[in-house]
Amino acid sequence: MAGNSIGQAFKVTTCGESHGAGLMAIVDGVPSGLPLTSEDLQLDLDRRKPGTSKFATQRREPDEVEIISGVFEGKTTGTSIGLLIRNTNQKSKDYSDIKDTFRPGHADYTYSMKYGFRDYRGGGRSSARETAMRVAAGAIAKKYLKQRLGIEIHGHVVLMGNEAAAVTDPNQIDWQFVNSNPFFCADPDALPRFEALIERLRKEGTSCGAKLEVIASGVPVGLGEPVFDRLDADIAHAMMSINAVKGVEIGDGMRVAEQFGHIARDELTPDGFTANHSGGILGGISSGQDIKVSIALKPTSSITTPGKSIDQQGQPVDMLTKGRHDPCVGVRATPIAEAMLAIVLLDHYLRHRGQNADVTQPVAPIA
């Protein structure tokens, strides 16, 4: 099964299924000498893991990560880093009655048609459980980016269903507050509305989508490879690989269709750019401004409202999904999106350093 790796100079390969023995990752390209412990990775894993909030799935997994290679005496050696998380709270019997049917909105049908066989337990490889390893690998990237380059990456929820948080200037966001509440939301006034929405969804047996914003600050100018490996193209690819993501915007995104050129262009002055409509990327290369990415996630397909589907014989069936599921996947998607942005940025930084370390820039960076 191809498509399990991302990156070139910094490469992450994952494996494992939702109800298998565990999840694993191989992380290649981490420079030597980076102080690293499992606790560094656990901080982000604890932000993503299930069972930590009444507003998310109640499957309880400790998600304790083990570093099994690539680190010696607390520092990276420059060799492949092996990561392992063991599954401990599988309830495969919740899925025994759907092994011969296809859940609408899930990958059951497409996996079966592509491979002729599938692991029906919790979605197998298509489950969002796989993203735990992305978060672990992304934590390595985040630490390197922050410690060596001063790059910081933060995400927050801006929309859940029909409830929106107040749009806030990233420079004014209290990130400590964002990370202390279960919705990763920067707007205190939105929290009661988000809570009420989740409770209503549970009572009605349905779910809702969400929109998140992820921001990388301190990114140097010059990251990105024209033309097919543009930085924004690789970011979009990484974000679209996250389960349930159906839309990605860089900067103003779709709103640029309504703008005029004299407003949308990010003009340059000796003191910096006058705007950042492009989200910190021009011509596929980072401009030195904050990189701003928004993603839209569809509603969870596993809901208790009955729906129509077919079985493996092509016969119509009525579906009622059992198991432990998120009323809104956006609640736990923020650290996943942060991880994917970190993976892409570190990959492009290492590629840029390898090719252009000796380049003399004609002017001082203005961002």
UniProtKB/Swiss-Prot annotation:
> Which Gene3D superfamilies does its entry note?
Chorismate synthase AroC
Its Gene Ontology cellular component terms are:
cytosol
Q: Which cofactor does it need?
A: FMNH2
Q: What is the lineage of its organism?
A: Bacteria, Pseudomonadati, Pseudomonadota, Gammaproteobacteria, Moraxellales
Question: Is Repressor one of the keywords?
Answer: no
Q: What name is this protein filed under?
A: Chorismate synthase
Residues bound to FMN = 125-127, 243-244, 283, 298-302, 324
Native organism is Psychrobacter sp. (strain PRwf-1)
Report the cofactor remark. Reduced FMN (FMNH(2)).
Tell me the residue numbers annotated for binding NADP(+).
48
* Any GO BP: chorismate biosynthetic process
Pfam family, any one: Chorismate_synt
Keyword annotations? Amino-acid biosynthesis, Aromatic amino acid biosynthesis, FAD, Flavoprotein, FMN, Lyase, NADP
Q: Belongs to which family?
A: Belongs to the chorismate synthase family.
The record's top EC class is lyase
Q: Which reaction does it catalyse?
A: 5-O-(1-carboxyvinyl)-3-phosphoshikimate = chorismate + phosphate
Query: What is the recorded function of this protein according to its Swiss-Prot or TrEMBL entry?
Result: This reaction introduces a second double bond into the aromatic ring system.
Q: How does it assemble?
A: Homotetramer.
| InterPro entries the record matches | Chorismate_synth (IPR000453), Chorismate_synth_AroC_sf (IPR035904), Chorismate_synthase_CS (IPR020541)
Q: What is its EC number?
A: 4.2.3.5
GO molecular-function term, one example from the UniProt record: chorismate synthase activity
Its UniProt pathway annotation is:
Metabolic intermediate biosynthesis; chorismate biosynthesis; chorismate from D-erythrose 4-phosphate and phosphoenolpyruvate: step 7/7
